[in-house]
Amino acid sequence: QDQVIKFTTEGATSQSYKQFIEALRQRLTGGLIHDIPVLPDPTTVEERNRYITVELSNSERESIEVGIDVTNAYVVAYRAGSQSYFLRDAPASASTYLFPGTQRYSLRFDGSYGDLERWAHQTREEISLGLQALTHAISFLRSGASNDEEKARTLIVIIQMASEAARYRCISNRVGVSIRTGTAFQPDPAMLSLENNWDNLSGGVQQSVQDAFPNNVILSSINRQPVVVDSLSHPTVAVLALMLFVCNPPNANQSPLLIRSIVEESKICSSRYEPTVRIGGRDGMCVDVYDDGYHNGNRIIAWKCKDRLEENQLWTLKSDLTIRSNGKCLTTEGYAPGNYVMIYDCTSAVAEATYWEIWDNGTIINPKSALVLSAESSSMGGTLTVQTNEYLMRQGWRTGNNTSPFVTSISGYSDLCMQAQGSNVWLADCDNNKKEQQWALYTDGSIRSVQNTNNCLTSKDHKQGSPIVLMACSNGWASQRWLFKNDGSIYSLYDDMVMDVKGSDPSLKQIILWPYTGKPNQIWLTLF
């Protein structure tokens, strides 16, 4: 047992809470998959190392310890003085290794929200979170009082403010805001949908094939609109701080991202899964077989995504690295920049011309030529070609049947929101009803003001300190393609730099391009 992770509500600040959550995340991280931290693979964890304790106190006098299972980041038990209490569904080994020397009791409910809410006679929406709620939870559990209803309610507070906050950047951020402003809050529909879909999102990322999830994950926006997440490059994936371990991607042993060796019995994701999806790209248009013509050599174009899923915009991502519509292959005519991309019979085409890798960053590359799929024309119906990879916006793609832009506000330094002002962009107090703070995130990696989706966030130059402004999307430049990363940065692939609030001073009214430092003025969050 290394040092106990501690948090006290006495004199707590958003900073002290942030440090607590970061320490907890660090202790729970077992590796990286697709560059996202993941809990340890249960097959690699010995039972005696399966649990960690977190000490929560609200003063010198009152503290409790919470036992957390490292394989799912879940609260399984707590200790109050010389007594310890275990949730009904706690693993058998929990009572062996957690809180030795205490008198152990079993609680009458398990750790699922359904059961906790039934015993609490309240739903999560009705239970306030924040410092006051946590202070009370610690006092109540420490008192050893036998009121089951109140026990369940206080555990709902602790689970969300510790476990859920460790799993999601947006939940830890929300708690941080409530500490900073001294106000309690109830979980909104977006937060609840994230809590309910943690295993689905984790599985989607780990089982993704060529960027596509095996199943859609349906989240909710704050105003109860469905948010469909069906691809690794969907910007919402960046709110994950920690994933549940589901399985290792089949090619993980070649992946430099995995920091632990694969053991024999470790679960490998199925490689049999071959998703059929749309491929959205420039200006949200879809990869389309021109005029439904499947004769060899017919060109592939960018066309507006149809209201219904239709065959000539549907592509099966095969495990042999071909991408097929109606059984025929997406094929490059040659290996020189500017060669056009066509539909072709898979068996008679040159094999290397039909192979494509879809990278996590939205690049679709033909390995033989090292050229990438590109929509050079901004007009509908333009022929797709292969070009030298420059991470241009017109070379950005996202797979999935839901190719419509994802509309969100973007909060950053000091919990202020990104706001469009003419051709400029800066930070202002967040206001859900302000159109100037709504951003449409397109499949091509562009970030567009909802007020005018012909305008894209663009870095003026390719150099450190360059201001970020709104410019015409019709350019399709590299300076208009952005990646939302799990470290909180909004990243320019071409420049290898990130969006940065100049000088950590919002009053300068400038967001600039700057090398990544990880400081708070480079950390952003989609609030959908």
From Swiss-Prot:
EC number: 3.2.2.22
Gene3D superfamilies from the UniProt entry: 2.80.10.50, Ricin (A subunit), domain 1, Ricin (A Subunit), domain 2
Keyword Hydrolase: yes
Modified residues (Pyrrolidone carboxylic acid): 1
UniProt 2-gamma repeat ranges: 495-528
GO BP: defense response; negative regulation of translation
2-beta repeats: 453-492
Entry-linked CDD domains: beta-trefoil_Ricin_abrin-like_rpt1, beta-trefoil_Ricin_abrin-like_rpt2
SUPFAM superfamilies: Ribosome inactivating proteins (RIP) (SSF56371), Ricin B-like lectins (SSF50370)
Domain notes: The B chain is composed of two domains, each domain consists of 3 homologous subdomains (alpha, beta, gamma).
Function: The A chain is responsible for inhibiting protein synthesis through the catalytic inactivation of 60S ribosomal subunits by removing adenine from position 4,324 of 28S rRNA. The B chain is a galactose-specific lectin that facilitates the binding of abrin to the cell membrane that precedes endocytosis.
Family: In the N-terminal section; belongs to the ribosome-inactivating protein family. Type 2 RIP subfamily.
Subunit note: Disulfide-linked dimer of A and B chains.
Name the record gives this protein: Abrin-d
